[in-house]
Amino acid sequence: MVTYPVQPWTNFIIVYIYVYVYEWKNLSESRPDCQLAGRTNNRQYMYMYIYIDVQMHYCECELCEDTCLYSSFNSLMENGMSISFSAVFVVVYALPVSLILTGSIDILGLCSSGSREAKSRLSMLSALISPFCRGGFKLGNVVVMSTSDERPFRPKRTSRSAIPRPLTCAASSFALLWHDPPFDFRLLFLLV
């Protein structure tokens, strides 16, 4: 039986506080290098922008003005959407990260088998998990890969792994987040 030194809700609280404070601070600042840096280098700001805007208004960097993200952030706050954002953030962002880091996402059946039902759930949730796993991640005997920012994640069949199933999600996600995180999640593990 695998035990984790940190409870799922502890990770949840840490992730929530970290992104809520640190990334909102960055998001509220003007991005004068938006046009020059391009979409890839501004990935973290783009994802946060997508999640806080409940109407899904995208700000493409090719057309982005210096104050695009800043103005949108202020307009959302003026319209009283901070509560709505908190609810969306918990469901879409902080909770999935916590489940992945602790391996608790296995309770959804994603890693428990190679059945069609599990793969169906995987493809439905791949878009949700994709911001945290840019290069791809492994769930059970299925590898989900991302080839570019524009293409969706696609499942690929692989041979069954000899690694115990409870470790598959947690270990793969942890390694990927540590190697190439969309945010600097390494600070979280230092705090823990």
From Swiss-Prot:
Main localization, broad class: membrane
Keywords, ordered alphabetically: Membrane, Transmembrane, Transmembrane helix
Membrane topology category: Single-pass membrane protein
GO (cellular component) term, any one: membrane
Subcellular location: Membrane
Transmembrane segments: 81-101
Further comment: Partially overlaps CUP2.
Name recorded for this polypeptide: Putative uncharacterized protein YGL165C
Species for this entry: Saccharomyces cerevisiae (strain ATCC 204508 / S288c)
Lineage: Eukaryota, Fungi, Dikarya, Ascomycota, Saccharomycotina
